């Protein structure tokens, strides 16, 4: 009778989608009776298991929705004097406090130096900390927003972008901007200014960004909001793609 009661309880847990709790309860039931914890301890174990399970699912969903270019982690980042990146700097950024302060990160450097990989790693770290992250190639994002104007989804997508705890804009400066793209970019930056963090990666030095935007008033507005509260990383050294075998950047 007790075994039947236990199985019914297990079925109810699964029916209520308490997957973590059900898995832990099943593990407890497989133990010898004299090793099974008392009811109060068991309840605490089951609740903890369910909490861990839901946090894990939430994190995995956030990582999937972010659509990172690379599956990267901060532990895999190569820090050296030659790269102009120290482990101390990386550790400070990895704690995520810049996100809480609404600060930006600008990662610049030549092609193949690991800009996108570093941005992906910081984004992945933010997801692990329970934050909402979105990763975009800037040219593709701006093209998508043009299409949104035609099908009526522009406002919805802009609101989603605005509310991300961390927005990553990769490939800044890779494609020229037209008037519509400049205005969309300005709106993105303005909506997030002083509230949410943005990571930008670019082959262009910051000194060239004004001419890249190519419209004085809009360039002034965008750059004032991006650069004012930005942590700058200029990666150096040879391309890491040449001799890379473990996708470690």
Write out the residue ranges for each language-model feature.
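Walker B motif beta-strand of ABC-family P-loop ATPases
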Residues: 166
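Interdomain "pre-motor" coupling segment immediately N-terminal to P-loop NTPase/helicase cores
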Residues: 14, 18-69
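Conserved P-loop
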Residues: 85-163
């Amino acid at each position: 009778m007790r075994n039947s009661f236990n199985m019914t309880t297990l079925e109810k847990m699964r029916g209520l989608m308490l997957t973590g709790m059900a898995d832990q309860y099943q593990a407890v039931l497989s133990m010898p009776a004299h090793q099974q914890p008392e009811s109060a301890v068991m309840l605490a174990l089951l609740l903890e298991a369910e909490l861990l399970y839901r946090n894990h699912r939430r994190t995995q969903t956030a990582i999937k929705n972010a659509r990172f270019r690379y599956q990267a982690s901060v532990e895999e980042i190569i820090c050296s004097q030659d790269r102009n990146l120290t482990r101390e700097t990386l550790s400070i950024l990895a704690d995520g406090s810049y996100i809480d302060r609404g600060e930006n990160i600008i990662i610049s450097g030549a092609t193949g130096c690991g800009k996108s990989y570093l941005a992906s790693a910081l984004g992945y770290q933010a997801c692990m900390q329970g934050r909402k992250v979105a990763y975009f190639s800037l040219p593709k994002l701006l093209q998508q927003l043009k299409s949104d104007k035609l099908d009526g989804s522009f406002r919805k997508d802009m609101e989603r972008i605005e509310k991300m705890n961390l927005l990553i804009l990769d490939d800044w400066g890779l494609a020229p901007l037209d008037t519509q793209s400049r205005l969309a970019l300005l709106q993105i930056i303005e909506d997030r200014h002083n509230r949410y963090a943005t990571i930008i990666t670019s082959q262009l030095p910051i000194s060239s960004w004004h001419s890249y935007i190519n419209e004085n008033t809009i360039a002034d507005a965008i750059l004032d909001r991006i650069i004012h509260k930005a942590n700058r990383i200029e990666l150096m050294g040879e391309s890491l793609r040449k001799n890379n075998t473990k996708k470690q950047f």
